[in-house]
Design a protein with these regions (language model features):
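Active-site-adjacent beta-strand/loop module that shapes the phosphate/pyrophosphate-binding cleft
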Residues: 98-132
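A structural signal for well-ordered alpha-helical scaffolds and beta->alpha junctions
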Residues: 72-76, 112, 116, 156, ...
Length: 171
C-alpha cells in the first residue's frame, strides 16, 4: 500500500506530457542496419570489393538474416553467386557480433547504428580469377589487401575503421 501511494505522488510530481513523450520516442529512433561480414584470407591479405554506395573497398557483406542458420544459408548463396566461387569450395564460421555507431557515407554523414556479424570463409579451392591482386568477377571489382594497407588507406580507415578493427581483433 505504501508503494502505491508513493508511486501516485511521484507520478503527480513528474508529469509525463506530450513533449516528454515525443522526446523519448525521438531518442529511441535508432536507424539500425544489420550486416554480416565475410572475411576471406589468403596468406596475410583479405578479399575486398569496391562498394559503390560507400565509395570504398569493403569486405563481402550481406544483410543479416533473423536466424544464424538462415544467415549462413543466405551468405553462402550470396558469396557463391556474387564472387564466382562454388558453395562446395568454402565454409563459413561464425566469429562474433559487434555494434557500431558512425556517420553513414550513403546518407550524407547521418549517424547510423550498425550491428556487424563476422564470419570467416575458409576456402578449400581458390578460383583462378582470384589469383591476381586485383580482379573482376561478375559485377564486382575485387582486390586483396592486408589489414595494414586497409588502415593506411584514408577512405577505408575513415568509413570502416570499426569493421577493419573487428576483423583484426577477432581473426
Amino acid at each position: 500500500m505504501f508503494y502505491g501511494v508513493w508511486s501516485l505522488i511521484t507520478a503527480c510530481r513528474n508529469k509525463y506530457d506530450a513533449i516528454t513523450l515525443y522526446e523519448d520516442v525521438a531518442n529511441m529512433d535508432r536507424t539500425e542496419r544489420r550486416s554480416s561480414i565475410i572475411a576471406v584470407k589468403d596468406a596475410n591479405r583479405y578479399l575486398l570489393y569496391r562498394d559503390l554506395g560507400w565509395g570504398c573497398d569493403f569486405f563481402p557483406n550481406h544483410a543479416t538474416a533473423s536466424s544464424t542458420d538462415e544467415d549462413v544459408r543466405q551468405l553462402t548463396t550470396y558469396f557463391a553467386d556474387e564472387f564466382g566461387i562454388p558453395a562446395k569450395d568454402f565454409t563459413l564460421s561464425h566469429i562474433c557480433v559487434k555494434d557500431s555507431e558512425k556517420p553513414s557515407a550513403e546518407h550524407d554523414g547521418e549517424v547510423r547504428y550498425y550491428e556487424y556479424t563476422l564470419y570467416r570463409a575458409s576456402v578449400t579451392v581458390m578460383p583462378d580469377a582470384w589469383r591476381s591482386t586485383e580482379f573482376h568477377v561478375g559485377a564486382k571489382d575485387c582486390r586483396w589487401m592486408t589489414l595494414d594497407e586497409m588502415l593506411a588507406d584514408p577512405v577505408i580507415n575513415k568509413i570502416n575503421h570499426d569493421v577493419v578493427a573487428m576483423v583484426r581483433d577477432n581473426l
